[in-house]
Amino acid sequence: MNMKKILSVIATLCMVAGALHAQELANFNFGGRGRPVVSPEIQGDSVTFRLKADYATIVKLSGSWMPNPYGGTIDMTRGENNVWEVKVALPSPEIYTYNFVVDGVSVNDPQNIQVQRDGTRFLNMLIVPGERTENYVEANKRGTVSHPWYDSKILGLNRRLTVYTPYGYENNPKKKYPVLYLLHGAGGDEEAWVSMGRAAQILDNLIEKGLAEPMIVVMPNGNGNQQAAGTLNLPVKQQPNYHDSNLSEAERSLLMNGYVRSLCEEIVPFIEKNYRVIAKPESRAIAGLSMGGGHTITASNLYPALFDYICPLSAAGSATPEQVAALKKAGVKLYFLACGDADFLFQGSEALDKTLTEQGLDHIYFVSDGGHTWANWRLYLNTFAPMLFK
């Protein structure tokens, strides 16, 4: 076959592949020959969701703003060109997640490329504009999110971090920065805070407005048996059962506090070796939600002189009077405790607040509406970040 024929065959194959891809997209839900499908569409005090589903018999909308976000749904109506739609009242300003239920199967909105990953689920985002969400959208001056790896001898794994460096970090080679270690909750990983938590957008906006100090934010993977987020499909290390009577005290201690030890003895030194940071307690902060709040409390209990800023959020954990006394002696500059009044861990936060008060440790106890939700954790980050390193 001569070169002209070869090129002709290649061109034909490319055209066929392109046509097949275009046909696939057209069949999917881009509206065919009718007007383009727009979803979601905010108009005044309402928002309309649409899905082109030619062969569906029942289509419903499920959204996190509904009274029962894990089971509540609203019926959608089939319209022209098999486009299903429903118009609902616009919820109050916040970031919400939603999906469609097509003949009993949950599917994402293919018209909305804004998605968040919560553990193993990918969900569409609806950002309702307003004062609450003004720091949750892109700023004009944006930092950089990267994913370095560190070796953990304690956990026996090569592990992945998410690191945010503020706008201007690359162009100021002599400038050093304080560091916030920001920890996720159960079911999350090193990507949770930049996906569901909008940490990069929040820090970008606060720094751009002059409300927060430029800082580096380190977001580790809090699952001690994981190398990285499940999206990388890496093997998970098998761990012994904590209640196994054959375990030694050292093995049991590693199961309990191995990750916190790795955080304080390996991740902190790794960051201080590889990034331009101010390696002093007054330039280190630690915060975490739920399980990460427990890790925050444990880290501050075991290493009281390491962090001058401590922020447990919706936390599972406690501190003894002796541990609080050690924090006072170390000169903690900020202890920011936060929880929602409907959170299932609220009583634990109440108890910790009482202990801190009785032991005379100055602290802020921030109680918000609502429960164990990302809406609260974004609010907390947006609230305490301006208090750091001042």
Where are these regions (language model features)?
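Non-catalytic cap/lid and distal C-terminal segments of serine-dependent acyl enzymes
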Residues: 23-31, 37-73, 77-390
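Bacterial Sec-dependent N-terminal signal peptides
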Residues: 1-24
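Short, intrinsically disordered low-complexity segments
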Residues: 3-4, 32-34
